[in-house]
UniProtKB/Swiss-Prot annotation:
This is Large ribosomal subunit protein eL42. It holds the Pfam family Ribosomal_L44. The keyword Kinase does not apply. GO terms for biological process: translation. It comes from the Eukaryota. PANTHER family: 60S RIBOSOMAL PROTEIN L36A/L44 (PTHR10369). SUPFAM superfamilies: Zn-binding ribosomal proteins. Residues 37-56 are annotated as: Disordered. Belongs to the eukaryotic ribosomal protein eL42 family.
Length: 103
């Protein structure tokens, strides 16, 4: 499991110095209904004839790459890719070394 703090001090390209950044997880936006491919697909699908293009079934990956979105105090935003992981946590409790396991 990957646990990342909600704030991180890192370099800002705009300020050109190390500043505190607010960390969030990137989420993809809603796909546009007016993109050329979507318009073409909808036009082809309309009317009689069923499914016109193959539906993708051969899914290979079980995880997605984690993308962090960091915002500087000046407002500049940058993104950083982490490795693949099954479980990701933002600002969770930090593990301590000499603590007994709680049941």
């Amino acid at each position: 499991m990957v646990n990342i703090p909600k704030a991180r001090k890192t370099h800002c390209v705009k300020c050109n110095k190390h500043t505190p950044h607010k960390v969030t997880q990137y989420k993809a936006g809603k796909p546009s209904l007016f993109a050329q491919g979507k318009r073409r697909y909808d036009r082809k699908q309309s009317g009689f004839g069923g499914q016109t293009k193959p539906v993708f079934h051969k899914k290979a990956k079980t995880t997605k790459k984690i993308v962090l979105r960091m915002e500087c105090s000046c407002g500049y935003k940058k993104q950083q890719v982490l490795k693949r992981c099954k479980r990701f946590e933002l600002g969770g409790e930090k593990k301590s070394k000499n603590e007994a396991i709680k049941m």
